[in-house]
Amino acid sequence: MTSASAPSFNPGKGPGSAVGIALLGFGTVGTEVMRLMTEYGDELAHRIGGPLEVRGIAVSDISKPREGVAPELLTEDAFALIEREDVDIVVEVIGGIEYPREVVLAALKAGKSVVTANKALVAAHSAELADAAEAANVDLYFEAAVAGAIPVVGPLRRSLAGDQIQSVMGIVNGTTNFILDAMDSTGADYADSLAEATRLGYAEADPTADVEGHDAASKAAILASIAFHTRVTADDVYCEGISNISAADIEAAQQAGHTIKLLAICEKFTNKEGKSAISARVHPTLLPVSHPLASVNKSFNAIFVEAEAAGRLMFYGNGAGGAPTASAVLGDVVGAARNKVHGGRAPGESTYANLPIADFGETTTRYHLDMDVEDRVGVLAELASLFSEQGISLRTIRQEERDDDARLIVVTHSALESDLSRTVELLKAKPVVKAINSVIRLERD
């Protein structure tokens, strides 16, 4: 928990009181938030105990036409808007990091509760934002920052607060899931599948943040922080994208009864000192087709949680898009508004555990290696001996003969990442190994 002393109880404005909203950003998500608040205003007022009233909308260009919005609501001065006394809740859907950080901190320090959908902001500055919210005795909500419409932050913070979470693993990026699903279902290569995702609007003009795993890493940091009560930033998350996944990798996975997904994996484990530690990583992963996450297709997202008492749980749905994200944002607005009307405050950041964050080399998992090797007697024995010398046990070896060499697909038992990395470097130095085409990690069903 934060070190600040416990703030005084917020008694609330009282039933029937209006709750003033400042909306920062009016793009796809902001427009949908405004539409939902307008369309369902009466219903929301009953659920909250008082009406939501939009006091202003901060935009970058006030001259741009915006259908259905009163011009007097628009402003280019976000800081002046959040300082208004009739604003109770600030909704940040701008995007980016540094400017939103300044605005959100200013809002919290001004005594406004904040709802944000900005995963990059939360992953990079959660500690600073949480401390500011605690000091001002206001709420900081960010359900939409992780998986769009899928409720997972709330369940981890509240519903599973009495349990011991062992792992959180999920498909948290719709763009990469669409691409991998297209490769799996059509046999297309990565470039063609990315082009199709771009054509359909699932991928940005610059897809780097998605396909290289950075977006998923931000979300993994948030999930790990909540699940394990330890501050984790995106810099703590090992990150590897999907741009090197080939059609041959997909075909090999299918032949083995697996599928490839880009997963965010957060785990608590016992390290070599015998103490609890956590790891957070994002990378392409082979999943057995029997695993619940293997059936998550197209641009859908899902988060798979394992807890000591509750067992296995999965949260599934739309992880992106204007309306799904706006749904999660508005859910947070309702929660913050209830506290403004009736008093109280939502649970804040809980980082009492302060567990060490393991180096990626301490990760233990299974591996799938695809190699081109010389096709002659003794090669298999030579390579098997190398794996054994490095302390890595082999689960299966499959060889495909070709005209001038052989394709070797090796699956290991569980091994340390550091041991596997060292072994790969030794394999590259072997004259009998012509190429290492891919190294992909495996998860159990």
UniProtKB/Swiss-Prot annotation:
Top EC class, one word: oxidoreductase
Q: Which Pfam families match?
A: ACT (PF01842), Homoserine_dh (PF00742), NAD_binding_3 (PF03447)
Which residues of this UniProt protein bind NADP(+)?
A: 29, 119, 201, 204, 321
Residues annotated to bind Na(+): 143, 146, 148, 150
Q: Where does NADPH bind?
A: 26, 28-29, 119, 321
Q: What processes in GO biological process is this protein linked to? A: methionine biosynthetic process; threonine biosynthetic process
This enzyme catalyses:
L-homoserine + NADP(+) = L-aspartate 4-semialdehyde + NADPH + H(+); L-homoserine + NAD(+) = L-aspartate 4-semialdehyde + NADH + H(+)
The pathway it acts in is: Amino-acid biosynthesis; L-methionine biosynthesis via de novo pathway; L-homoserine from L-aspartate: step 3/3; Amino-acid biosynthesis; L-threonine biosynthesis; L-threonine from L-aspartate: step 3/5
- Please state which protein family the record places this protein in: Belongs to the homoserine dehydrogenase family.
NCBIfam families assigned = PRK06349.1
This one is known as Homoserine dehydrogenase
Organism lineage? Bacteria, Bacillati, Actinomycetota, Actinomycetes, Mycobacteriales
